[in-house]
UniProtKB/Swiss-Prot annotation:
Annotated source species: Artocarpus integer (Jack fruit)
Subunit architecture: Tetramer of four alpha chains associated with two or four beta chains.
Alphabetized UniProt keyword annotations: IgA-binding protein, Lectin
Protein name: Agglutinin beta-1 chain
MF terms in GO: carbohydrate binding; IgA binding
Entry similarity comment: Belongs to the jacalin lectin family.
Bias-annotated ranges (Polar residues): 1-11
Residues covered by region (Disordered): 1-20
Top-level taxon in the UniProt lineage: Eukaryota
Its biological purpose: D-galactose-specific lectin, binds the T-antigen structure Gal-beta1,3-GalNAc (Thomsen-Friedenreich-antigen-specific lectin). Potent and selective stimulant of distinct T- and B-cell functions. Shows a unique ability to specifically recognize IgA-1 from human serum.
């Protein structure tokens, strides 16, 4: 799950919106 979230963040381009 954590890995998926990180990948999604990179794709989205929002290194904070997804993480937060």
């Amino acid at each position: 799950n954590e890995q998926s979230g990180k990948s999604q963040t990179v794709i989205v381009g929002s290194w904070g919106a997804k993480v937060s």
